[in-house]
């Protein structure tokens, strides 16, 4: 089931009809200064199904289809865009609160080469509201808000040049859930227009290469990942407005230099007798968030170390069906960082990301206005770091 | 300033309108007693435990909405979308079988659309928007000896709700600046689905289903805080409440009789609780801030929809070949309108509907070794005639013009059912 998302080519090796059910969750021990911060949707359900295409002859057993789903308990998706100065962890907060639906197909081209493709599905929200006084002086309102489908590709290949060696390559297309709404109202001749745009649940385009060494004693695998975070539009909301007595005004957004990330993973899987499999692994990934943020933003993150362990109980029989149980536990350690702010000198101009401005113009007759008046919650410094603990249990049933 | 809008448009499930899979569409949806496997996920959840092998149904349909208001094209969006069904049976022992499945319908253009049209503007309140939404129906069932089955599940939809949309306008360093934050959620809504199926005689099958009511509610509150000292202070709240895709609670009963071993007659009767359709538009404007325009508000009378009873009749003939089976289908349905006479402020167009259908299918039943399991290919054609009617207003009480409405819907669909 996991192959739909990890590498769809792996579906071609799934063999037989299998149903997977499970649950997973996470707990945050991430800190903003001395305060712990939570994840908004920390738990969800897992569902998966794989089956061979009903083809015989030369195509027998070569094509498998699969479906992987992650289901939140009460929501399909959530789009959160914050004030530019709000301290939060953009890697964790606003990227995991959505239903995931990934159908895929894997094809065994030769006995040593497989390819696969899957689609990552979701929905957005966009449209417009127009209202003005009608002929009866009541409001005539027109609303046209659409929930469009969003689909992005995951493609993969796997090659086994030697009996003991398998290599793989995966591309995951950038994914995000868009939100846009335009409210155009007119009352008593006064326009009240608000145009909002944001995107949530962002995942960058990723390229992953992996290698696995298979022996009777253990399987050792290693992955390297490149993620194009530099294309991230940011976790903020873009606003254009026209309000009574205020006139046209657009929200000012800082230009954040997001960093592309590189990561590496190393995993070991070893059987313990016929019925138990032990697993362990370590991963490291650089942070997409700039380490220096002298201006308005307080985007918290750091290089990430992941330590994982798991156990699988295989070939248990329930009502004559083969069942496999898999349990995993994981700790992600986010390295600590301190962000220090810079205040622009009087008359100095620059992007909001590069420095803070004195918010109150100095008045020689008012001592309270003298010096820098800053309300940014990260001023003069803000500390971050911590851990995220995750775990899950799945049951795979042979149909 | 407070601007509050509340409005509703009504709809039934798009799969109720055109059927789930072309096999069901060819018999006008009279499938409560005969659905098994993937198509049962929508037509009777009990049937997902009646299949032998896992099934995947893939279909696509297109409907030309040739509807008119005042003799002109009513500009109702054509219907097109993909149906996906899945049923996975598990045989526990010789007596008991479990099954799980899901019915999905995905419109091509979007998953859903929230549409609000001024209620005094003539438009098709049911057909304007109702066929244009995604349907998600996960179900599970248990069957005993293939004679009795019970299924349950949910029809899933989402609301669209803003927990917070704030736009702050103020002065920083002597300049006007704005900053915003936003928290929008698509929370899940569920309506229960229950199905019962029985085969009291080798040639007779009966089914009963219940589905709760469902709707998609939009709640967007956009608050702009303005703090420009000496110029203007206060706030502006644009608050939108709209409810779309109201799908009434319904109970369907169906009977199917194999008149001959290869000829089946099926009939369904469905009671739709349209009388619970919520009140329509309620608009108000509360003015504050420094500009002080007057309060604007309106009250619209209750929708007063009436419960309806639909009837569907279908016939299916199967010719079993050596390797390939051929099936021919026909059906008809009568769907009365729940919309009351529009003599007041609202101008909702609708009409009683006559539905005639025809279809056919090929089953590649024994094509080993090319195919290891049978595959079905089905085609269906439907004609929905919406009765023409002339609506005249009570001119003394409500201003407004008379309007006429009616028309036709032509729908065609193809589907394939693959077993694994």
Where are these regions (language model features)?
Chain A
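N-terminal beta-strand/beta-hairpin edge segment
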Residues: 34-35, 46-48
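Surface-exposed strand-loop-strand hairpins of Gram-negative outer-membrane beta-barrel proteins
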Residues: 27-41
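N-terminal periplasmic accessory domains that precede
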Residues: 4-10
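Transmembrane beta-strand segments of Gram-negative outer membrane beta-barrel proteins
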Residues: 12-28
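Outer-membrane beta-barrel porins/channels
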Residues: 16, 44, 50-399
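Glycine-rich loop/turn
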Residues: 1
